[in-house]
From Swiss-Prot:
The keyword Protein biosynthesis does not apply. It comes from Cochliobolus lunatus (Filamentous fungus). Keywords: Membrane, Transmembrane, Transmembrane helix, Transport. It comes from the Eukaryota. It is a multi-pass membrane protein. The chain crosses the membrane at residues 22-42, 59-79, 89-109, 120-140, 150-170, 179-199, 217-237, 245-265, 269-289, 319-339, 346-366, 379-399, 419-439, 479-499. It is found in: Membrane. This is MFS-type transporter clz4. Belongs to the major facilitator superfamily. TCR/Tet family. One of its GO terms (molecular function) is transmembrane transporter activity.
Length: 557
């Protein structure tokens, strides 16, 4: 497979660290992702409350959609921008923007202000998650990458667990729903300070002005227009438009033209393309990207619509609906750690991905049976199956893509993977919302048709009214789960495309596995504490400790 040569103007940022320093860096990334995931998963629990408070019953899905769209747009850019400006500078900057955006969410006085702040949160938060993976790939060899990324998983899942609980708690406090954002903002500031001190950094070889010239501005602009136009259009018909109106058709047309322009720019014009099209010429990578998209769809649709199912159909409390997310997210930490250890010891990633996708398919099919009378034990077991599937497949897919591409493409491949994951998540939310509202429009009794415009806030209905609309809600939510099941089927088809050839399947430029320790400055984990890892003099620093000098291994002192 031929690969486009990456310009050498990009400064080297790979810096394998000694074990003790490596653990500190990984734990720092874990703390940051803990904070990000509290915000990410706490919002869905608060949607009905926010809708009532701000009078946003007709548009409250945009609290999540605006964040996901912004995350998707900017996830395309962070990989290449970090190649140009450096990982640490971009990472810390994103944390500061995230903290300011969270504060703005807490002080939002209108739906539009809230959605704007959520978009800013998505633009920065998506970059933080994206760069966390890229930074980890800089400091850990491919063979150990799954193992150390599994160390980060508990922080992410803990944030996923704490998010709904904290959100439900503050919703009942005098701070109301605003308290969640007022809590996260200072945590973001502390994370920025911590990351600024601890994370390794490199000194760019060019000036800031020279680096600005390298940015693929045309590609960035056209990709933004294409993504925003598409996402706004697909979120509209079920919620805001009576069918495919002229506005929707116009948005899709503009998006299509922008997408074609983006492809041409990346193919012919860009010196440092945002997404090198050569990676899509690798069948294995293309299949894995498709699976990443569908995995994101199913996972995010569950995170957003399980609370809707619990509160609006089953009439369970926000606390119970938050607890109901435990099976789908808490189990991921254990499964991710097991998968990481397995990949490090076996040198294979295929088994965990195949097992995860199979369980995701089974769980999604079983989920279509959720209804008003479904036993809670059945609900919990099905969500556990889906959680195990996501945990087994999600991070190993990153390793698989990196195993099929060059080291010089590492950041953009990781960025592309996150783009497809976020795009799948965004489509999962907005398309599921459109399906929900479209079904309600055709299923609700005539006296309750108006509820199709505000399906997320039913607090004002009495028990008789709730019983009258329950069949329509049951049908609408089932249609949402059927769409997720279809996405799971598509995800399973990707298993027949790629092969697991182990870490040795990568181009020779990428062979930084553990077996190549003498040539690459990598050694086995149990020997890392007695080794000093050195690189070319690229002014790489770890906090206040330097890690420069030539690329070689020295034992002891």
């Amino acid at each position: 497979m031929a690969h486009t040569k990456i310009p050498t103007a990009l400064h080297e940022q790979e810096n394998f660290l000694p074990k003790k320093k490596l653990i500190i860096v990984i734990l720092t990334l874990g703390v940051v992702l803990f904070v990000i995931n509290i915000d990410h998963n706490g919002l869905s629990t608060l949607l009905p409350t926010i809708a009532e408070d701000l009078g946003a019953q007709k548009s409250i899905t945009w609290a999540g959609s605006s964040q996901l769209i912004a995350t998707t747009v900017f996830s395309v850019l962070y990989g290449r921008l970090s190649d140009i400006f450096g990982r640490k500078a971009l990472f810390v900057s994103a944390l500061w923007v995230f903290s300011i955006a969270e504060l703005g969410c807490g002080f939002a006085t209108s739906p539009k202000m809230l959605y704007a702040m959520r978009a800013l949160t998505g633009a920065s938060g998506g970059g933080i998650g994206n760069l966390s993976i890229i930074i980890a790939t800089d400091v850990v060899s491919l063979r150990h990458r799954g193992q150390y990324m599994a160390v980060v998983a508990p922080f992410m899942v803990l944030g996923n667990i704490c998010g709904p609980l904290v959100a439900a708690g503050v919703a009942k406090s005098p701070l109301t729903w605003r308290g969640l954002f007022w809590l996260i903002s200072p945590l973001g500031v502390l994370s920025a300070v911590l990351a600024g001190y601890i994370l390794p950094s490199t000194t760019p070889t060019d000036t800031f002005k020279q680096n600005l010239v390298k940015v693929d501005w045309l590609g960035s602009f056209t990709s933004t227009i294409a993504i925003v136009g598409f996402m706004v259009a697909v979120s509209g018909p079920g919620a805001y438009h009576a069918g495919y109106s002229l506005l929707v058709i116009s948005l899709l047309s503009v998006s299509g033209v922008a997408f074609l322009a983006f492809l041409f720019i990346e193919w012919k014009l860009a010196t440092l393309p945002v997404i090198p099209l050569t990676i899509f010429a690798i069948p294995d990578v293309s299949a894995l990207l498709m699976q990443t998209f569908t995995l994101g769809w199913v996972n995010q649709a569950n995170v957003y619509f399980v609370p809707i199912y619990a509160q609006n159909l089953r009439q369970w409390s926000p606390v119970i609906s938050g607890v109901l997310l435990f099976p789908i997210i808490a189990v991921q930490v254990v499964v991710s750690m097991i998968a990481g250890r397995w990949m490090s010891k076996s040198g294979q990633y295929g088994l965990t991905i195949r097992l995860g996708v199979a369980l995701l398919l089974i769980g999604s099919l079983l989920e279509t049976k959720f209804g008003r009378e479904t036993h809670p034990a059945y609900v919990i077991i099905v969500l556990l199956v889906i959680g195990i599937g996501v945990g087994a497949a999600n991070q190993p897919m990153v390793i698989a893509m990196q195993a099929h591409t060059k080291k010089s493409e590492r950041a953009v491949v990781t960025s592309s993977r996150n783009f497809f994951r976020f795009l799948g998540s965004a489509c999962g939310v907005v398309m599921s919302a459109a399906i929900l509202q479209s079904t309600l429009r055709t299923s609700l009794p005539a006296a309750y048709k108006h509820l199709a415009d505000s399906p997320y806030a039913l607090a004002g209905l009495n028990p008789r009214e709730r019983d009258a609309i329950a069949p329509a809600y049951e049908r609408a939510i089932r249609h949402v789960y059927i769409a997720s099941a279809a996405a799971s089927v598509l995800c399973s088809l990707g298993l027949f495309v790629w092969k697991d050839d182990g870490y040795e399947s990568r181009p020779t430029e990428n062979n930084d596995d553990i077996e190549h320790a003498p040539a690459r400055g990598i050694e086995r984990e149990d020997e890392q504490s007695s080794l000093i890892y050195d690189r070319e003099p690229s002014a790489v620093s770890y906090g206040t400790v330097e890690a420069g000098e030539p690329n070689r291994l020295r034992r002891g002192g």
